[in-house]
């Protein structure tokens, strides 16, 4: 985790998206969920933008809301930060999707669309510090 923090601080990014895969004790759980830095408005907006695109994926079986999280990667810098949990490896059907290049491309494109949506929002809204 320290190495990731060093990379973030050295890069001085406009935002941070850390991509992960989830695991849960109940194997029927599936879908993508985004966590954001608690108390940070821009992180929350970024999470909402990405989550809304994830929820529109045809493979999505339910809509998630982004959740505030108290995780090291979210709190280690001043930049808007989210963790994108892109699916559940504990769900055999979703795991089968997650290993395919086609589904990985869908996830990557969803992340891209969510980031672009967020950047458009903060660029055009003078109330939001970008």
Give names to the regions the model predicted:
Residues 1-130:
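Active-site-proximal helix/loop segments of hydrolytic enzymes
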